[in-house]
Amino acid sequence: MKKTQTWIITCIYLQLLLFNPLVHTQGICRNRVTDDVKDVTKLVANLPKDYMITLKYVPGMDVLPSHCWISEMVEQLSVSLTDLLDKFSNISEGLSNYSIIDKLVKIVDDLVECMEEHSFENVKKSSKSPEPRQFTPEKFFGIFNKSIDAFKDLEIVASTMSECVISSTSSPEKDSRVSVTKPFMLPPVAASSLRNDSSSSNRKASNSIEDSSLQWAAVALPAFFSLVIGFAFGALYWKKKQPNLTRTVENRQINEEDNEISMLQEK
């Protein structure tokens, strides 16, 4: 009985070992993103809305898959956040903003390191270079949040040739620069809209639905077959051991009857 229980436990652990690698193929850099990204809302509310932040924007971010631009975009975000950090002195009145930006810099630097470890192959990059632009805090951290969200589902999926080239027939990108006239302070509630750029999110949603269905199919099917195979082995083992267990019980009953007979004879 103990051997049967041991085999069942072994089968369960085997399924876990087979299933976990399949699950962890999704979001290759996901564990580098900490809860400190939630402080972006607070930071945007603290900065004047007319404050301009320089960022080299990667062309095609709104129309191409994330693996086409995420590596270069996160490097440019690291440069811009580091420059922004240098503009805040590490003193009491500026400590809140300084601390938040410092944590964001560490997150982005970790993501840069992760992307260096997981380089995309067979990807034909666009010949266009990042364009220096001026963004308000809301626009800048909207790009930051979009990049962070891209890491949650980022995979090494470029097994075939993937051209990351902007079509010449596609409409020109909307200029993200914002006029400095008539500045006003950004209420904290408005910062929650950073993640919701309607035009880009709709395109992202349509692409992500198709990608996620394929990803889950790739994960679920091998896991299902591994579970079936594991339980089949367990059933065969149990069936093989069942006659031995039956014979053991019968032998035990015979021995008990023999002992009772011998005790009666002795009396």
From Swiss-Prot:
Keyword annotations from UniProtKB, A to Z: Cell adhesion, Cell membrane, Cell projection, Cytoplasm, Cytoskeleton, Disulfide bond, Glycoprotein, Growth factor, Membrane, Pyrrolidone carboxylic acid, Secreted, Signal, Transmembrane, Transmembrane helix
Glycosites: N90, N97, N145, N196
Q: Does the keyword Membrane apply?
A: yes
Which residue positions does Pyrrolidone carboxylic acid occur at?
A: Q26
Disulfide bonds, paired cysteine numbers: C29-C114, C68-C164
Q: Which residues lie on this side of the membrane: Extracellular?
A: 26-215
Annotated signal peptide: 1-25
Q: Where in the cell is it found?
A: Cytoplasm; Cytoplasm, Cytoskeleton; Cell membrane; Cell projection, Lamellipodium
SUPFAM superfamilies listed in its UniProt record:
4-helical cytokines (SSF47266)
Instruction: Recount the PTM note.
Output: A soluble form is produced by proteolytic processing of the extracellular domain.
CC terms in the record's Gene Ontology section: cytoplasm; cytoskeleton; extracellular region; filopodium; lamellipodium; plasma membrane
Q: Name one GO biological process term.
A: positive regulation of cell population proliferation
- InterPro entries recorded for this chain? 4_helix_cytokine-like_core, SCF
Matching entries from Pfam families are given as: SCF
Report the protein's function.
Answer: Ligand for the receptor-type protein-tyrosine kinase KIT. Plays an essential role in the regulation of cell survival and proliferation, hematopoiesis, stem cell maintenance, gametogenesis, mast cell development, migration and function, and in melanogenesis. KITLG/SCF binding can activate several signaling pathways. Promotes phosphorylation of PIK3R1, the regulatory subunit of phosphatidylinositol 3-kinase, and subsequent activation of the kinase AKT1. KITLG/SCF and KIT also transmit signals via GRB2 and activation of RAS, RAF1 and the MAP kinases MAPK1/ERK2 and/or MAPK3/ERK1.
Q: How does it assemble?
A: Homodimer, non-covalently linked. Heterotetramer with KIT, binding two KIT molecules; thereby mediates KIT dimerization and subsequent activation by autophosphorylation.
Q: What is this protein called?
A: Kit ligand
Q: What is the lineage of its organism?
A: Eukaryota, Metazoa, Chordata, Craniata, Vertebrata
Quote the gene name from the UniProt entry: KITLG
